[in-house]
Amino acid sequence: MGRRCIEELVEFRQQLYNCLPRWSDALFELTDAALCASGPVTSVPSLSLEPEFTRSHGSLYKALAKGRIDGDRLRRLLVDAAPKDWPLVFAVDASTWDRCDAECSPERGFYYSASKHSAGQPIVAGWSFQWICQLCFAPDSWTAPVDARRITPKEDTADATIDQVRGLVELLRDDGEVPLFVFDAGYDPIALAHGLSDARAQVLCRIRDDRVFYTDPPPRPNRPKGTGGRPPRHGRRMKCSDRRTWGKPSETLVMTDPRHGRVTVTAWHGMHPKLCGRSRWAAHERPPIVKGSIIRVEVEHLPKPTTRTKKTLWLFWSGPGTPNLDACWRAYLRRFDIEHMFRLAKNTLGWTSPSLCTPAQAERWTWLVVAMLAQLRLARRHVDDLRLPWERPREPAQLTPVRTRRGFRRLRAVIGTPASPPKYTKAGPGRPKGTRSPPRTRYPAIKKAA
């Protein structure tokens, strides 16, 4: 088992090298330098000082500026390398690479940021990247990133998400299991459900507790044609915050969880909202009827002591058949693992640390970070546990991503690298004497129309 897993890591590294058509050696050594660095990556140029990067810092800059990554091939590689024993449950979320002061960087947009403010508002200018990570139900923070895409300011977030999910579904194995995609409350569940209605996918999205939904209208008695007016499109009204309007649930699940105590999951199937003929529905002759299941999750207590008293969660599900209530509420709680992945990518691997100029360079660096995360997951059972004196010993299967990264340098010395050694040459002539570079073009951040 162990030998087969390490062979998978070696094969993944070779295939990753094949996904780099231009500046492959420098780009691959850049990933090794970031994985083998002794501390968090705070400066990408400093990675050229790591022994795993055998080239100069100039090659590092040129690799990010002029290199090329085959995104389609790398996406297929990530899907094939994902754990086969994990369920087809995926978390989808976007994170912002803030570039507030980068006036020379094009295609910046304004995005919400909970930790950084601009002019007193939680809004920053930068690039938005949407990640898709496969989740597991094991009690750890490991995820398997399978895709990352930059959403431009001119794109509609819902349309971009639908295209990204469709592209991933085409790459997944078709063994009868329908993939479940979990979204936070910032996404439009109705738009996603409508756009993915003909895809092999389930959509699970958190909704506010003041949303209103409707049942199907009751059947009308037979009447002569041309009498009775237009038939109703909506039935009984259900407001999530008003218990009196709920009606009889379609399905109820009660269980006991060691972390949350008594868990009650209630579902109402065949519900739909009342849509207006504007925004994305303006092109429709009549707003569509988008049906789904409303799921209410109530827990006895939260895992840790907190001042928060709200212990109720509302979800909207859509997909073929009816939802698996036990899988739905557990999948949404595991969705928060993608937040841990973002923290690892930013604080440890330095995803948003480099001050890159163009979005194309940012996309290349993002793909490299995704490849780093995949290598850490494949190497978790083969690295030495270089724990700090105050840390408890762990079994190889229980190592965290950060502790796995500490031992990657020793493992890399054993498995080697597919990158070729550098070819030494003399320095070039440089810039002709007396020439000056013209001022660079300024690009204002794009404000998306409401």
Outline where the language-model segments fall:
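Gly/serine-rich nucleotide phosphate-binding loop at the start of the catalytic core
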Residues: 1-65
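Single, function-defining residue in the core of a domain
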Residues: 1-23, 103, 139-450
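Generic alpha-helix structural propensity
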Residues: 26, 39-42, 55, 59, ...
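Contiguous, well-ordered alpha-helical segments that form the cores/surfaces of helical PPI scaffolds
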Residues: 32-34, 133, 369-373
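Short secondary-structure transition/capping motifs
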Residues: 36, 49, 62-67, 117-122, ...
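Short low-polarity hydrophobic stretches
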Residues: 47, 93, 132-134, 203, ...
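A generic secondary-structure signal
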Residues: 50, 77-80, 167-172
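Active-site-proximal, Lys/Arg-enriched surface segment
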Residues: 62-140, 145, 284
